[in-house]
């Protein structure tokens, strides 16, 4: 158990450096962001220069920057990845989040390593192995319950990180191959085609339709607001928000929401602290209901629930705001529970489909009543009857508040002024205990009005508005009240604040790679199937080093050509439609979890049910045209057809 075992880390996502800065200002203790490559999010990469500028910004608040390098790597990518890791280390980032074990075999600087959720950490054995092999922090599978989390926490000394909010992958992370099988875009390489958000028809083993054209693999969004205390007790110390594709207002809002929640718990309990410095003040009221979500679930943290899926629509409908009274040619009359504004996004559900429109103009027509003129009148609106429920998925005024400065974060500093007529001595001590002393020589006379002079000194020293500090305490220990001209005092204070900045950055300590345990750990299995995602020689060497004998290639290597589980998930469609043998009354033997089918257009997937661990396997086969494509990540794959043509030998004559 480390010294910091009482410190809680709120970890926010950032698509880019601008969002990362705002996440920190809104209260994140750490931010995870993609570097220039291998970041498992197609289109969310950032230059080394941007990351190098972000690092000191974060470190001034004691906040950390984690870079995601969590794709599986082709052999041709190992050298570029090794160079990139060296460059990232030089920018000063705090840690790398990785999936590919080959990275541990590369010749890289001693950067702290975190195991990505893509490593599929569900068991004590695997968690302990990863902790023993050099991972400081491990991101557990989102499907775990409190008991499983607690067991892993008790068995390892790694910091436990857990997803508390955002989109849920329906499959175990790292155990989903459907995107690659159908499109050649590998989820393990950050290019998921999101087959789970498509509509499917479910059929039983007799071919009978159980459910028609629903989003049967689409999960609601994760929201652990109600479970934070229980997760802390189970050993979670890093609370992760999903969303490296999400926009600025989402990250501001959700970060602020959890900052306030965690601060309240820290305040109440007394034995916990936040993992970085400063206090955060928000200039808006955070609401998880007002930015994009697909409904909320706490997934399996407490127990299996029947309502984890968002089958009707993966779209965002927002909050109920009232009902539609009447629809006219170019406007509608509505009764509301909340005031409306021009620019609001409103919607109704018609036969489970979301029919949405922007309010071009709204006019109050009475007590809680408005007339709304949409930008474009949806044709389907005329189908609805009076008193049809109305939702708002874009609250214009609330969103506007988020586009402005919506938060401030300041670090506490204690100020002490001492000295005598010939020299003033100013000491600034930050809340972390970093202290600097600055002196000002001169001939300072006794002031005529002692009380006024003392107040002037106090106020002048506490003026920290332009810095990231606030004065927690100001002490003046002078033999008498001295007169110091304001211009001199201001410059003196500004120089001292700059010195404190430099001293705090210099005293910042980043982590480093954890040494491998002695004796070296042994991997819990001796044979790895394609589910282990071993895609390069270095990853093979890693597993051989720790006792694995037989290693099958990753799915992306195109050696699994037949029917295999392209998704393994805790989400069970038998359970969702009350067809689970475990729930059946009467003679259990007569109930078998026979296979079912999911159909989307020409695409037919078989569902098999593994009832002991309570899992569903989605069985599919890689498409033939994908087998003909170059392997993802290989040099060949990055060459365009035009460039290939140029390599043909020139015709003579």
What do these predicted regions represent?
Residues 43-52:
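Aromatic- and glycine-enriched glycan-recognition loops and surfaces
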Residues 94:
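Short, conserved active-site loop motifs that form the nucleotide-linked donor/cofactor pocket
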Residues 117:
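Residues at the C-termini of beta-strands that transition into short coil/loop
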